[in-house]
Amino acid sequence: MKALVYTPSLPRFFEARLLGKRFPRKLLPLRLAEVPLPEREGFLRVRVRLSGVCGSDLALLYGKSPPSISPFFSFPAVLGHEILGEMEGSLVAVNPLLACADRGLPPCPRCQEGEEGLCQNVAEGPLAPGMLGYNRDLPGGWGEWVLARPERLHPIPPGVPEERAVFAEPLAAVLRGLNK
């Protein structure tokens, strides 16, 4: 499949830090490439319709996020964690988390409490560290396909425009913050 692949580079990181917004786009650590779509037991194949560009994605691309974040993410990776997909003709929002159950691990205390966003095993198990969009083993939404477990797929009601539905993940983050 075709995908935009992010590959971190220390020289590019320091160049981007130095040049700031004047950093030439052609030097971004991002390239269009043909990448294989892995097979994973228990994961479904979801065709990507749209994927957002988050501030965290831009921070990576323009050198605002330091390479020290790598213990929580794994690269090179197909970015994109705000994902609107299509499954069997229906639109679905894809939750990008890769918590204990996704990693084939027994639930950690946070996952047992229903706090999967605070999973203590985000860097453990057979999958590389990180969530969809920041994981070298599973591609994010800047590719043609993603893999997700059925529990991570949330149906979008008919009639909701795709350009709005793609904001399901950031909306969920806001609502979660308001409910705390």
Predicted regions and their residues:
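Short N-terminal strand-loop motif that marks the start
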Residues: 1-79, 144
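Glycine-rich beta-strand-centered segment in the early N-terminal region that forms part
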Residues: 36-51, 66-113, 152-159
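NAD(P)H dinucleotide-binding glycine-rich loop of Rossmann-like/cofactor-binding domains
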Residues: 70, 81, 99-180
